[in-house]
């Protein structure tokens, strides 16, 4: 009987403390500022409802129309980043293991003659098995647009203040990922 009375008193006391604590946390007294509430239309970059696409306005944009070989090469976003596609890609993006228009200019043996960026050594190496494929392109690399994307002529919605740091001048336009992949690991 004594134990159950003690348990009951402990329960009442702890409940009272919990209620006092919670009421202090939710009190509106004092000099607290109220948070600004945002409507659903103000959320995100689109400034439109998130429930349907009826009022979503997409600004007109165009991809580069410069032909391959005549376009400027973009500096990479960071060291060993996949290079962006600076040229027109009309008719080039239907890719399969058997047909890939990108390789007709970007394979190392033809890249210089085509004035194209050559595919790096990492594309001729199986990252899963660690096997050097001796000049054969890794089958995991045939879908070029998985990493490389054409650039549209648009104004960024958000200012990008990121400034990359490259360890060498050539890293701005070339990849040495296969040579640096295990840095700091071993």
From Swiss-Prot:
Belongs to the NapB family. Its main location: periplasm. GO terms for cellular component: periplasmic space. Disruption phenotype: Mutants fail to grow by nitrate respiration and also fail to reduce nitrate and contain increased amounts of NapA. Keywords: Electron transport, Heme, Iron, Metal-binding, Periplasm, Signal, Transport. Residues 1-20 form the signal peptide. Binds 2 heme C groups per subunit. The keyword Iron applies. Component of the periplasmic nitrate reductase NapAB complex composed of NapA and NapB. It comes from Wolinella succinogenes (strain ATCC 29543 / DSM 1740 / CCUG 13145 / JCM 31913 / LMG 7466 / NCTC 11488 / FDC 602W). Heme c 2 binds at residues 123, 144, 147-148. Electron transfer subunit of the periplasmic nitrate reductase complex NapAB. Transfers electrons to NapA subunit, thus allowing electron flow between membrane and periplasm. Essential for periplasmic nitrate reduction with nitrate as the terminal electron acceptor. It is found in: Periplasm. GO terms for molecular function: metal ion binding. Pfam families: NapB (PF03892). GO terms for biological process: anaerobic respiration. Heme c 1 binds at residues 87, 102, 105-106. This is Periplasmic nitrate reductase, electron transfer subunit. Gene3D superfamilies: Flavocytochrome C3, Chain A.
């Amino acid at each position: 009987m004594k134990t159950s009375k003690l348990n009951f008193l402990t329960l009442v006391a702890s409940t009272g403390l919990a209620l006092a604590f919670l009421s202090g946390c939710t009190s509106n007294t004092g000099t607290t500022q109220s948070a600004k509430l945002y409507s659903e239309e103000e959320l995100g970059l689109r400034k439109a409802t998130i429930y349907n696409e009826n009022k979503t306005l997409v600004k007109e944009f165009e991809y580069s129309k410069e032909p391959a070989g005549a376009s400027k090469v973009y500096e990479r976003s960071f060291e060993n980043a996949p290079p962006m596609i600076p040229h027109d890609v009309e008719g080039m993006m239907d890719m399969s293991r058997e047909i890939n228009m990108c390789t007709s200019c970007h394979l190392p043996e033809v890249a210089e003659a085509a004035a194209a960026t050559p595919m790096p050594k990492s594309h001729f190496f199986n990252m899963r098995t660690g096997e050097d494929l001796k000049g054969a392109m890794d089958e995991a690399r045939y879908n070029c647009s998985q990493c490389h994307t054409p650039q549209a002529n648009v104004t960024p919605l958000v200012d990008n203040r990121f400034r990359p740091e490259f360890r060498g001048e050539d890293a701005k336009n070339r990849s040495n990922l296969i040579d640096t992949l295990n840095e700091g690991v071993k």
